[in-house]
C-alpha cells in the first residue's frame, strides 16, 4: 500500500502532526516547480521524511538508506514505497538512479548530510550531492526543519518531548 497516494490519509496525517508536534510549513510553494529539482532538508530525527513528504507533491522521490530495512519490518514496509531510491552498500548504483531520475526532469528529496545531526546544525554534505548538481543542473531548494530535533525520534543528547 502506497500511503502517499491516499489524499485523505495525507490530510489526516497533517492534522495529527499539527496537533502532536505543532507542525506547520512555511513557503511550500517553493517545492511546486518543474523538474529537475533537488530538495535538500537538514536531518534531525527519524521522522523528518514524514514532515517533508507531507509538503511536496506526489511526483517527488526520496533517497534513503536501505540499512534500517534490514533490521526492522516497519522500516522495510516504509522503504518499500515506489517513491524511494534506496542507497545500499554500493552508493554508485543509487547515484546513477538519482542522476537518471533528475536528467529525466524528475524531482528528488535528498538528506544530503547522510546522517542525522547531533547538534541541530547542518553538517558537511556528501560528495554525491555535488556530483548530482554538477551533472544534472537541477533547481536546488533548501529546507530547514526547525524544532525537529526535539521529537522523540532524534539522536541528540538533549531534551525531547511528546507534544
Question: Model-found features: residue ranges?
Answer:
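Helix-to-loop junction immediately C-terminal to a conserved catalytic motif
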Residues: 6, 11-43
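Short, basic, glycine/proline-bearing loop/turn elements
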Residues: 12-13, 80-86, 112-116
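A cross-family acyltransferase "interaction/gating" segment
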Residues: 27, 121-163
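Catalytic core of membrane glycerolipid acyltransferases/transacylases, capturing the structured
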Residues: 33-90, 153
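Cofactor-binding loop segments of dinucleotide-utilizing enzymes, especially the Rossmann-like FAD-
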Residues: 42, 65, 113, 145-146
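Hydrophobic/aromatic ligand-binding patch that stacks against planar heteroaromatic rings
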Residues: 51-52, 78, 100, 131-135
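Helix-adjacent hinge/juxtasegments
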Residues: 83-107
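Catalytic-site beta-strand/loop segments enriched in glycine and acidic/polar residues
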Residues: 101-130, 136
Amino acid at each position: 500500500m502506497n500511503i502517499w497516494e491516499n489524499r485523505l490519509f495525507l490530510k489526516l496525517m497533517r492534522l495529527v502532526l499539527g496537533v502532536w508536534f505543532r507542525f506547520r510549513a512555511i513557503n511550500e510553494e517553493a517545492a511546486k516547480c518543474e523538474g529537475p529539482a533537488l530538495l535538500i532538508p537538514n536531518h534531525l530525527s527519524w521522522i523528518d521524511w514524514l514532515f517533508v513528504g507531507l509538503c511536496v507533491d506526489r511526483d517527488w522521490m526520496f533517497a534513503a538508506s536501505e540499512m534500517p530495512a534490514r533490521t526492522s519490518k516497519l522500516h522495510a514496509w516504509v522503504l518499500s514505497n515506489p517513491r524511494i531510491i534506496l542507497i545500499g552498500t554500493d552508493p554508485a548504483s543509487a547515484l546513477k538512479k538519482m542522476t537518471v531520475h533528475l536528467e529525466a526532469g524528475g524531482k528528488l528529496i535528498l538528506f544530503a548530510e547522510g546522517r542525522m545531526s547531533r547538534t541541530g546544525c547542518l553538517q558537511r554534505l556528501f560528495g554525491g550531492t555535488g556530483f548530482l548538481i554538477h551533472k544534472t543542473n537541477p533547481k536546488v531548494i533548501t529546507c530547514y526543519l526547525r524544532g525537529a530535533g526535539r521529537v522523540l525520534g532524534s539522536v541528540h543528547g538533549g531534551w525531547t518531548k511528546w507534544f
